[in-house]
Design a protein with these regions (language model features):
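A conserved short beta-strand
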Residues: 26-37
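Conserved small/polar residues in nucleotide/adenosyl-binding loops
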Residues: 1-5
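Gly/Ala-rich beta-loop-alpha elbow adjacent to hydrolase catalytic centers
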Residues: 9-14, 18
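Aromatic pocket-lining residues of Rossmann-like dinucleotide-binding sites
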Residues: 21-22
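Short, proline-enriched alpha-helix->beta-strand connector loops that line the catalytic pocket
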Residues: 46-51, 77-80
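C-terminal catalytic histidine-bearing segment of alpha/beta-hydrolase fold enzymes
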Residues: 68-107
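Conserved serine/cysteine hydrolase catalytic core
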Residues: 37-48
Length: 107
């Protein structure tokens, strides 16, 4: 099985897991919505997968600052990361689904 044609997509805790597990691997991409970095998480190498991080600006479950922390860490090691912030809270609105579809189409 080739994983280069696979994308991991996760929401909230699932996004945290997709990011942690997916970025070191040669995947086609990683998408995280309303995710956060696990405590003491850091990247040692440039992520192999292009990454899309999406987050609601009004998320009170996982504050949008978590997206900034993830973006900073991925950027620090030279990773390719796109950010999409939408109005709303801890959810996946249609506009985020559409943004994810655009990301996937470009892979």
């Amino acid at each position: 099985m080739c994983i280069r044609d696979r994308v991991l997509f996760g929401f909230s805790q699932g996004a945290a897991m997709a990011i942690e597990v997916g970025l070191p691997r040669p995947l086609a991409g990683v998408i995280g919505c309303s995710g956060y970095p696990h405590p003491n998480w850091s990247l040692e190498h440039v992520p192999q997968a292009p990454t899309l991080l999406m987050h609601g600006s009004g998320d009170v479950v996982v504050p949008v600052a978590a997206q900034a922390a993830l973006t900073a860490e991925i950027s620090r090691v030279g990773g390719q990361v796109e950010v999409f912030t939408f109005s709303g809270g801890h959810t996946i609105p249609l506009e985020a689904v559409e943004r994810a579809a655009t990301f996937l189409a470009a892979l």
